[in-house]
Amino acid sequence: MTPGDTAVADVSKDGAFVRKDAIFRNRITPDGEYTPESGRYHLYVSYACPWACRVLSLLHLKGLTEHITVSSVHPTWQRTRPNDPDDQHAGWCFLGEDGASISGPSGVGSFPGGPKHACTPDDLFGSVFVRDLYDRAMDGAAKGTRFTVPILWCKKTDTIVSNESSEIIRDLNSQFNAIAGDKTLDLYPVKLRPAIDEVNEWVYHGINNGVYKCGFATSQGAYDTAVTELFRCLDKCEETLGKQRYIAGDVLTEADVRLFPTLVRFDEVYVVYFKTNKKFIHQYPNLWNYVKDVYQTPGMRHSVNMWHIKTHYFTSHPVLNANAIVPIGPNLNLDEPHDRARFSK
């Protein structure tokens, strides 16, 4: 099976991965088309996807789970138009029934779904694929689009509000305080915004997207460039976290919510799958303790499902892992004690 119409195929002539921009970029505002209301919005997520898990983190940190409903896809991609031999796209599907299972997009393996495995149906429309939601929002003209999660869906207007995670988390942080369980938590405080913005920039290019530049590269030169920059940025994180508790200062911020999902996947997936094996995160003393610290922050662990994470990556891309074999380890313990309290004031 070829990469088809998926992100794996988004490479330049020199073999470098080039991520496409999100296409839905509406914002939640008090006086705009999309206002902050309880029960109006629905999130489509994957526990495997680091971008979607940013949004899940905010949902739990801000105490918005009673106000925004959620559907979670199965981790293993499927052919989204299985009866069309000319359409090779593989992507997210829903498998909400316990006892049901699916194979990978090339027909290999058997991977269970249902609530026992944190997989839900599409509670709004009964969609089979996330692609169906894009078709619904784009009047059937979605072919060629990257059918990504997270999706913030508006039940009133029956369309996608946003599929850009960085903007969704900003809005969840600031626009729903009237109904949020934690109204005082501000992950983008004014005094730290310059530091947060600076960190977000190099973390995104070097680490968040950097691991994909390594894993999806199709030339040695593109891989070498990406992996060198990735570890330069990880070394920078290690140095920074030797001086302060969090990546942008002394308190948990949006920058941590954006960095953490990549780090928590690194040793379990990226070291093998994306060839980022120069060094493990658990070999960085400050970074490893930081990962445990953030994970143990109330609300954050709800965004981590390692079965989803490993199952997705190792079973969804036949061009990278033809037999869909999922490695058994290393199964690191994120609940181990950490030493980050040494920075507490």
At which residue positions do the language-model features occur?
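C-terminal alpha-helical interaction module
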Residues: 1-345
